Amino acid sequence: MELKTFPIGSLQTNCYMAWAEGSEKCILIDPGYEPELLLEQVRLQRKTLEAILLTHGHFDHVGGVKPIAAETGCKVYICAEELKQPLRYSDGLHYTHTVAEGDVLHLAGLTLQVLHTPGHTPGCVCYLCGDTLFSGDTLFAGTCGRTDLPGGDFKAIQASLQRLAALEGDLKVLPGHGMASSLDIERRYNPYMQERIW
């Protein structure tokens, strides 16, 4: 997988551009801000944007979706559970497809499995692509997503983190904010992945 990371906006949300080697298409994950910058990056890579994948619906992850989708006509995927809180999206959340636990997406030459990981929001998902986990705001390096915002659920994120800890092997962890990590490091040193603290 070819990958570029763009920390964008005031909250430095990580937007990821990814594609399989040799593919003429790419995907964006969580384009929260700066749509013109992201569109320019797609052009610089000489790719066609096939889809936007959203890990959840907070503004810092979805703010750039509408203009990017309008410009490119790309598909936009979000977990169906995120759409059950309409007041959060009074300005209209643009999407074309919903995903659920266990769905497998084939985009830009990549195969991505959807893992429903509620807690930060009811519809948070991670995307597992080979040895890489796009963890959104569920798992960060050394910590986890907050649960004190509307729709947050402390017990749910506990279960989601334990589920991620139980995934097989080591994985590269690419979170919604902050530095990349690995699942082995998070299992060992992230206090929120230690079952005993709950």
Predicted segments, located by residue:
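Core dinuclear metal-dependent hydrolase active-site scaffold
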Residues: 3-6, 16-17, 102-128
